[in-house]
Amino acid sequence: MKTFDELFAELQERARTRPEGSATVAALDAGVHAQGKKVIEEAGEVWIAAEYESDEALAEEISQLLYRLQVVMLGRGLSLEDVYRYL
């Protein structure tokens, strides 16, 4: 299990080192527009899971949304501090 901050650090490292076959690298290369679409898709899946599925399924969907949001952050060059400033 990892925290939000740990995941972000891991994704930053992947963005920096660009390991071959990395889904995160492919997502970053697809651009912010493509990742924005994925955010919308995952948000819809969170909503459906919240309405009709188990807590476990909901937690998994939320984790996927958080991942996509972090990829958008990296694509735009935002840090966690940039976001935490508004919490």
UniProtKB/Swiss-Prot annotation:
EC number: 3.6.1.31
Catalytic activities: 1-(5-phospho-beta-D-ribosyl)-ATP + H2O = 1-(5-phospho-beta-D-ribosyl)-5'-AMP + diphosphate + H(+)
Pathway stated in the Swiss-Prot or TrEMBL entry: Amino-acid biosynthesis; L-histidine biosynthesis; L-histidine from 5-phospho-alpha-D-ribose 1-diphosphate: step 2/9
BP term (GO), one: L-histidine biosynthetic process
Cellular component terms (Gene Ontology): cytoplasm
Keyword Ligase included in the entry's annotation: no
Membership in a protein family: Belongs to the PRA-PH family.
UniProt cross-references to PANTHER family, sorted A to Z: HISTIDINE BIOSYNTHESIS BIFUNCTIONAL PROTEIN, HISTIDINE BIOSYNTHESIS BIFUNCTIONAL PROTEIN HIS7
Protein name (Swiss-Prot/TrEMBL): Phosphoribosyl-ATP pyrophosphatase
